[in-house]
Regions:
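Terminal amphipathic alpha-helical/low-complexity segments used for targeting or macromolecular assembly
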Residues: 1-36, 146-190
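Structural signal for interior beta-strand "rungs" in well-ordered beta-sheet cores
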Residues: 26-27, 32-150, 154-155, 160-162
């Protein structure tokens, strides 16, 4: 009889093969995905992309590192329907730190989101914008070119503007959200 660990390894290898067509090389660049990361069906990951430990990419995301690079940190979750892209001009990479939550149907383009930040559902973060650690972009917001959302701030609106300082409870929620998605991806793997 096969042990449970062997069966899990076989399943992961089989599932990885099923998802291979979702992971595409662009020129000489092939995505580097940590073996502990979770990639849900329907997602497309292209080119110069690096995905960290225990990160999760949920259903129908597009992460396209063709004319620049994308880095997604450890324990970060990119939720369903999100699009992440880059710009070919200097500074056009997209960097997403560790323990970040990016909500459903977001668009991140050539921007930086630091560790333990939160981008709410349906938000857009444009070129050269920065979301600092422990900062929050409210759902449905548009963070325009070059804006910097400082640590401990919530920004909201289209275009996004400073809304308020975050409470300690809201800051804790960011970490909890990242941890919840690590647990959720484990449930999907089992």
């Amino acid at each position: 009889m096969f042990s449970e660990k062997i069966l899990l390894k076989l399943y992961k290898a089989w599932n990885h093969r099923l998802n291979m067509y979702h992971i595409l090389k662009y020129k000489d660049y092939e995505p580097k995905i940590d073996e502990s990361a979770f990639i849900a069906g329907g997602s497309r990951i292209v080119g110069k992309v690096e995905i960290g430990k225990n990160a999760s990419i949920w259903f129908n995301c597009v992460i396209r590192g063709d004319v620049g690079s994308i880095r997604i940190g450890d324990e970060t979750n990119i939720q369903d329907g999100t699009v992440i892209h880059v710009d070919r001009n200097p500074g056009g990479d997209t960097i997403i730190g560790n323990m970040v939550t990016v909500g459903h149907f977001c668009m991140l383009h050539a921007c930086t989101v630091h560790d333990k930040a939160f981008v709410g559902m349906g938000s857009t973060v444009m070129d050269h914008a920065v979301v600092e650690s422990e900062a929050m972009v409210a759902a449905g917001s548009l963070v325009t070119h070059g804006k910097v959302i400082k640590s401990g701030e919530v920004w909201a609106g289209r275009p996004a503007k400073f809304l308020k300082k975050m409470s300690d409870e809201e800051i804790k929620y960011i970490t909890q959200s990242a941890q919840n998605y690590v647990m959720l991806m484990r449930e999907y793997e089992n």
